[in-house]
Amino acid sequence: MAKKSFLVKTVLMSMLTAVTFTSFASCSNDDDMAYEPVSPVPTREHVADSSQRVIKFEGVDNARDMGGLVMQDGRTVCFGKLVRSGKLVKATDADVAILQDRYHLSDVFDFRFALEMSEASDRVISGVTYTQVSTMPQKLIELQEKFGAGSGQLSTPGTIDVLMKYAFDPEVQEMVKQLYPIIVTDPQSQANYGKFLHGVLDAKGGVLWHCSEGKDRSGWGSAFLLAALGASRQVIVEDFDKSNESYATEVEALSAQVRDMKGGEGAVEFIQAMVGVSTKNFEATLDLIDQQYGSMEQYLENQLGFSKEDQNLLRAKYLIAAN
């Protein structure tokens, strides 16, 4: 029982714990009269690498503007409206200024659950509505609370030792592969991802969503949002995989240790999934969605409750014709 408890804690640590670019443009169009476009839009000084949409925050990890991504109909996502990131616990005054002045931030969606939020509360930004949309299935939350797993950051004492110890355990390796399927098939998670999509549709200003490290649960939120906006599978996968660039140094260092200890590919993949993201597991779960629900389009409508009409309104609000 003790080992099982520790296995659960280890696997959950990661879950609690960076395309195509065209041009910078504001999203003002005749179909979006109810929405006041962000002005001024972010400049290259506020997007460190415009082709990758990385935002230079001081205290917020893994932050990206979703602008510039090309949808299947040729339109692009507007810059200055949609941001994905890690938690806002250490957001600095300069970070807040960017979110207020450049993004006109009105809404933050937090995919973490109550214990995570109580251990590491977001910085409160004046005028912003915070909405909790926990997308960790309840059965995993209960296990995590029972065994007292923390936020799962690599800076937590002993976390690296635990990761290295269980990287070689086939049972844990297999458990990691099941995390994404559990999330996308859980009714509570589906309901909250649907709530997130409707929140993005209804937002009066810029929107930011995050979990702990901004990679797994936020990655799925971004995937569903991009799918609703009309992105191809390739664009969705590439955006999800970009989080690996944010954590590449840590992944490479720990993977090297695993190889030095004669660990096989299963152990290396475990480190990749826990510290970065497993794009392999992500794609396998996209396949699962197609197999179990018919298609991503049907999943959005039937599981997340986001209709075709909702999707058309979302596209009118956040897409613009390419220059």
Residue ranges of model-derived segments:
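Bacterial N-terminal signal peptides that target proteins for export
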Residues: 1-14
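N-terminal non-cleavable signal-anchor helices
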Residues: 9-12, 20, 163, 175
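Non-catalytic accessory regions used for complex assembly or targeting
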Residues: 13-14, 18-21, 32-37
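C-terminal motif of bacterial Sec signal peptides marking the signal peptidase cleavage site
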Residues: 22-26
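Cys-dependent protein tyrosine phosphatase-like superfamily
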Residues: 27-207, 220-323
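Catalytic nucleophile loop of clan PA
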Residues: 210
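Ser/Thr-glycine-rich phosphate-binding loops at phosphate-binding pockets of nucleotides
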Residues: 213, 217-218
